[in-house]
């Protein structure tokens, strides 16, 4: 029995069938599985501009395989284009909108399965949230990574353009050089090319078995990506017939595998937020402390941007995520019994993958010679973050700094100070009231952090925030500080000049002010007025949970 029988079977469903006939159903089609294709196509961003072609390939393959595809649209927000503006407040919000849209369309139309096609950062976790909520057979198709831009023999990504702004203000390049970077950074379709958030989350989904092997590192414009979309539709139909559902795959071990791979490839801080959200929706007991536990045993073995040398297409050519997983599996750092949407175990999927990385590349290193001996996403706690915070310490020579606080109530004020060269070596920059409630929406601080790196201060200035960081960020940065300022977190009590210690070695984020003074400040603190009362941002601020629990809106704290 199919779920779609609810709208296709029986005399009383004659009106329903009448409408389905108008969109292409014939007599022979009413017993076929109805497969939703959640198409994230948009000309808003290069990440999604190629998704319509992929969705059409999947649609045709589904029909040829014996299913009845029904395509519908989802939205996207371009993180790169909205970065540094008020529009970035809508980025994390769009994750919930995408999840709600997919859930609404699939459940409203009694679909038997769904193929989600996405590109930009929030498309991936948004689709995964919907899949976990509905628990109908599902496959995710990643739109693919952009190829690197080229300038002067160097690979460029969009982060190169953000960093060039800081280089310009510090006098290291001129406006013509900045313009040259701008014109060459993004050469075509695809998601941002380093191991930034989109590529991190697609790697996580591949690891957890809800997308096909090698698919997360394919280039958007290569033919193999279109072939992958078609094959994914065939696999979805098989999953419907075999009744393989997302919650069969999204186990505690699968989340641990995803975290291990994210550490190994040097992935984005946003993976912490998104995996916590997906796990919570899937009913899996995952906490922020699990990331630290796994970090302690999984090294970084991939030399990828933003802090490394290579881009995601280089990782693909070196063997992709399966090669990374095989190394981890052989070292006992991966659960090989986890199932995939193809019905195979992860160990079976990796059986033919070489046990050592190719000798003619240095993108993927052996575990005996890692880039970093431990994972790069450290969970810091202390009186500034009693619920935890996430530090990205890749590319940092010494992840320890004690210095005076430079406090800003918004990203814009912080960026202005950096570009005016008012931030000096040794400073601890605090950007607050940018959390899930306070922002609302947890804006990403790529513009300030890139400007700091561009000015040569990446190792000598720390930036902490209750907001987020782009996957393109690196340096001594600490985000997701919880509790956030807007709900009374200690970050809201920091005053300019206070001493703050950021110590990733000791996993400490500490405001060096005595408890009596903090008690006095807390008594004088009052909850700030909401920045938005109506519209989606007002609604989001009222519903959203703490970042330490994934910042979800359908399961209040």
From Swiss-Prot:
List cystine links: none
What is the protein name given in its UniProt record?
Dihydroxy-acid dehydratase
Q: Which residues bind [2Fe-2S] cluster?
A: 47, 120, 192
Reaction catalysis annotation: (2R)-2,3-dihydroxy-3-methylbutanoate = 3-methyl-2-oxobutanoate + H2O; (2R,3R)-2,3-dihydroxy-3-methylpentanoate = (S)-3-methyl-2-oxopentanoate + H2O
Read off the InterPro entries from this record.
DHAD_IlvD/Edd (IPR050165), Dihydro-acid_dehy_C (IPR042096), DihydroxyA_deHydtase (IPR004404), DiOHA_6PGluconate_deHydtase_CS (IPR020558), ILV_EDD_C (IPR056740), ILV_EDD_N (IPR000581), IlvD/EDD_N (IPR037237)
Q: Copy out the cofactor comment.
A: Binds 1 [2Fe-2S] cluster per subunit. This cluster acts as a Lewis acid cofactor.
Q: How the protein assembles, per its UniProt entry?
A: Homodimer.
Q: Which residues bind Mg(2+)?
A: 79, 121-122, 444
Residues of the active site are 470
Q: Sorted alphabetically, which Pfam families does this protein's record hold?
A: ILV_EDD_C (PF24877), ILVD_EDD_N (PF00920)
For this UniProt record, the keywords arranged alphabetically read as follows: 2Fe-2S, Amino-acid biosynthesis, Branched-chain amino acid biosynthesis, Iron, Iron-sulfur, Lyase, Magnesium, Metal-binding
Say yes or no: keyword Metal-binding present: yes
Q: What is its EC number?
A: 4.2.1.9
Where are the coiled-coil regions?
none
Q: Which cofactor does it need?
A: [2Fe-2S] cluster; Mg(2+)
């Amino acid at each position: 029995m199919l779920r779609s029988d609810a709208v296709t079977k029986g005399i009383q469903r004659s009106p329903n069938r009448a409408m389905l006939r108008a969109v292409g159903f014939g007599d022979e089609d009413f017993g076929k599985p109805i497969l939703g294709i959640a198409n994230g196509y948009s000309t808003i961003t290069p990440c999604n501009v190629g998704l319509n072609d992929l969705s059409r390939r999947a649609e045709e393959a589904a029909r040829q395989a014996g299913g009845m595809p029904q395509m519908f649209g989802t939205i996207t927000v371009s993180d790169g284009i909205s970065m540094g503006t008020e529009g970035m407040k809508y980025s994390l919000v769009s994750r919930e909108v995408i999840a709600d849209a997919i859930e609404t369309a699939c459940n409203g139309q009694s679909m038997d399965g769904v193929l989600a096609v996405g590109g930009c950062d929030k498309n991936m976790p948004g689709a995964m949230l919907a899949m976990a909520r509905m628990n109908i057979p599902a496959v995710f198709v990643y739109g693919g990574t952009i190829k690197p831009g080229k300038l002067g023999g160097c690979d460029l990504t969009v982060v190169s353009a953000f960093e060039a702004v800081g280089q310009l203000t510090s006098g290291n390049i001129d406006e013509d050089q900045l313009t040259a970077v701008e014109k060459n950074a993004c050469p075509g379709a695809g998601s941002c090319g380093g191991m930034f958030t989109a590529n991190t989350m697609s790697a996580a989904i591949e690891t957890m078995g809800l997308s096909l092997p090698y698919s997360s590192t394919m280039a958007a414009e290569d033919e193999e990506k279109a072939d992958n979309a078609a094959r994914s539709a065939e696999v979805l139909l098989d999953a419907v017939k075999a009744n393989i559902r997302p919650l069969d795959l999204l186990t505690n071990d699968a989340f641990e595998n995803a975290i291990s791979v994210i550490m190994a490839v040097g992935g984005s801080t946003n993976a912490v937020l998104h995996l916590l959200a997906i796990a919570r929706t899937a009913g899996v007991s995952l906490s922020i402390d699990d990331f630290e536990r796994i970090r302690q045993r999984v090294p970084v073995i991939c030399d990828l941007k933003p802090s490394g040398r290579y881009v995601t297409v280089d990782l693909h050519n070196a063997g992709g995520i399966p090669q990374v997983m095989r190394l981890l599996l052989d070292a006992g750092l991966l659960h090989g019994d986890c199932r995939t949407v193809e019905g195979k175990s992860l160990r079976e999927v990796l059986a033919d993958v070489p046990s050592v990385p190719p000798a003619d590349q240095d993108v993927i290193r052996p575990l005996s010679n890692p880039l970093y001996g431990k994972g790069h996403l450290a969970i810091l706690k202390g009186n500034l973050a009693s619920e935890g915070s996430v530090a990205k310490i890749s590319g940092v020579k010494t992840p320890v700094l004690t210095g005076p606080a430079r406090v800003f109530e918004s990203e814009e004020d912080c960026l202005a100070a950096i570009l005016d060269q008012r931030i000096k070596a040794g400073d601890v920059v605090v950007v607050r009231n940018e959390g899930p409630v306070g922002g609302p929406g947890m804006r990403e601080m790529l513009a300030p952090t890139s400007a700091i790196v561009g000015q040569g201060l990446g190792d000598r200035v720390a930036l902490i925030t209750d907001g987020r960081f782009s996957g393109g960020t690196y340096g001594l940065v600490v985000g997701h500080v919880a509790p956030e300022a807007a709900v009374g977190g200690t970050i809201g009590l920091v005053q300019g000049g206070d001493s703050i210690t950021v110590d990733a070695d000791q996993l400490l984020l500490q405001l060096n002010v005595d408890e009596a003074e903090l008690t006095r400040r807390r008594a004088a603190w009052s909850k700030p007025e909401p920045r938005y009362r109506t519209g989606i941002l007002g609604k989001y601020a009222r519903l959203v949970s703490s970042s330490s629990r994934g910042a979800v809106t359908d399961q209040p704290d």
